[in-house]
Amino acid sequence: AVLGPDVEILDLLNIDVVVEATGNPEVGAASALRAIRLGRHVVMVTVEADVTCGWALANEARSQGVIYSLTAGDQPGTIMELLDWAQTCGLKVVAAGRGTKFYPSDADGNPAEAFGRYGYNDELVERRRLNPNMYNSFRDGTKAQIEMCAVSNMTGLPPDVRGMHQPSASLHDIPVLFAPKAKGGLLESEGVVDLANAVSLDGQTLVPNHIETGVWLVVTSEQGLIREDLSFYGLPTDPSGERALLYRPFHLCGVETPVTIAQAALLNTTTGTPQSQPTSEVVAVAKRSLSPGDVLDGSGGKNVRGIIERRSIVAREEWLPLGFAYGSAVNQQVGAGEVIPSAAVPRQTGVLASLRETAGSGHSFSK
């Protein structure tokens, strides 16, 4: 294994698999594209890049005969492992998701305050080299929106509503809440991505028996005996027994990445990869009122946060994907809580924009 600070190291070493983990969408896209064109497999940890152009990178990888995969151990990859298993068993996925610990008071949080909200001291922050913007994206909800967008684009499962429902839920609540409205649940339609919040409705305390760091699926079957088996073997179900919960209570980001590396290098398979065109996008939302000249500071910043929406709606409304909200100054007034229009920032000319345009995403945001 080689840890490199610069993408040029790819030209110098005979590397089979590149793990992209910079956390910056433009840098991540450029690094991954270069690796793919050099014939290297890519394990994409930078989900901020994946949700902006991952389908284009995956298409390029397929054309080059190499693997582009998200990683085992991070929630999107862990969800895909569970989903692949469930579908192989013949189960129908009603909803796929992960846990969160989202306090409404954190929605407009500032990265300068993120470590304090976690209760982290300076020694821990320094020793683990923690990034305040990254940890702020965990607190303001952006990271969960990004990760479920990655799952959406791997599976074709859309969000049921913009930003997802994200109800406060215990493990036993999940198969009850993620059911069609006609059957007492929240969903307009089945086959969606969503979140289960560990924070109670009071916005302060935690729900008992929550799944904050885990991932889950609500599943059903057309076969009555199979539905009965899911309950008989002890899975949490809704009162009717029609829907059951599959879950894994943890994920080990970084620890499990070697699994995906081995899959790519030895088996030429992925943990999960985007479909050829995206199902969803993460759009940039103003955390506060923005005036011309204010600079967008990306995921976990003080000025913007991200929410998931269906790609068809994003393209129609010409909203700005979060991946383009890094370092650009807005040229118009944007109200707090408003989705930022793509016209509010200068022309996009980087690798992200180029990849989207050449992949035919239908909305390149490069003009």
Describe every region a protein language model picked out.
Residues 1-17, 22-26:
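A structured beta-alpha segment of the ubiquitous adenosine-cofactor-binding alpha/beta core
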Residues 14-15, 39-41:
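Glycine-enriched alpha-helix->loop->beta-strand junction motifs that scaffold or abut catalytic
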Residues 17, 34, 56, 60, ...:
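Alpha-helical scaffold segments in soluble metabolic enzymes
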Residues 22, 26-38, 45-74, 84:
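Rossmann-fold NAD(P)-binding glycine/threonine-rich loop
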Residues 54-57, 80-83, 98, 104-111, ...:
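Short acidic, glycine/serine/threonine-rich loops at helix termini
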Residues 61, 65, 69-139:
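Rossmann-like NAD(P)H-binding beta-loop-alpha module
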Residues 116-367:
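C-terminal catalytic/substrate-binding lobe primarily of soluble NAD(P)-dependent oxidoreductases
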